[in-house]
Every structure is written in structure tokens, then in C-alpha cells.
Amino acid sequence: MGVLSNKIDKEQLKPGDHIYSWRQAYVYAHHGICVGEGKVIHFTRGAGQEIGTGTFLDRIIFSSSPAHPSDNPCPRCGDSPRLDGVILSCVDCFLCGGDLYLFEYGVSHALFLVKARGGTCTLAESDPPEDILHRANFLLENGFGVYHAFKNNCEDFAIYCKTGLLVSTSISVGRSGQAASLVAAASAIVSSPLRFLTTSFSGLAAVSYGMYCVSRLVSDIGVRRDIVKVPVERLVANPSF
């Protein structure tokens, strides 16, 4: 892996790794947890399910569904009893023809800001592999709630499996770096009063990018104050947590 790319080979995968693959020309990334033997547990949205956005994101995020239809199952995955929610797939079906990337944990502030695209790393530290795999397998059996693009998506699922951390406030966009980046980008352009301090395009771009970086940083699960550690059994017993 390099500073600007987290791309890895399948041979480098280890159980407990948080992986992702870009969809729709790098518009959106799908995330999951590697559990070994070439399998991935991930949280996905099935066909015909609403996620509450009412926007083009409904069509984009449908790309997180498995690559094989139910009437033509993958020979490695087998005849899966469900194609939405928390599911188990082989790595190839998870990638859906895309490249494989490793999500990084415990990065420095400098590296976090260099990786300007959200949804690739976090300042938060990862738990040991045995804890990660326990959460992922428990949620495979019990579910992770209703998929929502901004508040409960595949990246939220993977980050929870890796850290056990949940957002305790109801006004948040969740743990997802992708969702936080979208909100940060919009806020940087529309909401910042600093944009009135410059009239040049380059000045506006610099101010907007600075606000974007600050918004991303304060939204990261590794620095937020509204984060609590929740055992997976408690999460399943109280899904409205």
C-alpha cells in the first residue's frame, strides 16, 4: 500500500481485515470484513428496499448487492438463503469485478488529511482479530438493522466490527467516512462564512478545502466525543441504541 492508495492483492488478506472496493466509477465504495477462507461478511441493500434517501444514491448503493442473481448462484458462495442485510460472500462476489483495498486504522492526523477521499482510513484503533470476527459472525446471524446510506451503511457495519464503537447521538451521519465526506464537502462550500473573505476562485478553493478537511477530521470516529463502546450482544438486544 502507498500513501495515496490502499490497494492490495487477495493473497495479502488476513481474517479480521476491513476491506472495500470502489463501485460506479469511484462514486461509492462497498465495505466488508474478511473472515478467512476467501470469504467476506458484509452489509448490503437488496433490490426493492428503500434506504430513506429518495435520491440517486438508492440506485448507486444497489451496486453493493451480490454479483450473482439468486437463480444463478456463485459456485463458491453456494445458494445463499438471503441476498440483503448481513451476508457471507466469496471475495470475488464481494469485489464484483472491482479492485481490492484495505481500510486503515490508527493512522496519524497527517496521513488522515493526506488521504482526502473519505472512507479509506480512520484515526480509531482496531480491536484484536478475535473480537472483530466475533462481532461479524454474530451480526451475520442476527442482523445489523435497516440499511441507510447516511446513518447505517456497509462502512458503518465494518467499522463497528473492527472497533465496537457506536455513535450515541441521533443527529449524526453515523461512523461512515464516505457519508461524513459528502456532508463535509457540502458544508465547506455552502455554510462557511470564511468564503466571504476571498473573491478569487483559488482563494475560495483553498478556504473550502480547509473547511472540508477540518469537517472530515472532527467527524472521524477516532476523535468524536459522542462515541461509546457497545458489546455486539447488547447492540442486537437493543437495535435502537
Spans of model-derived segments:
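Cysteine-nucleophile amide-bond enzymes
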Residues: 1-241
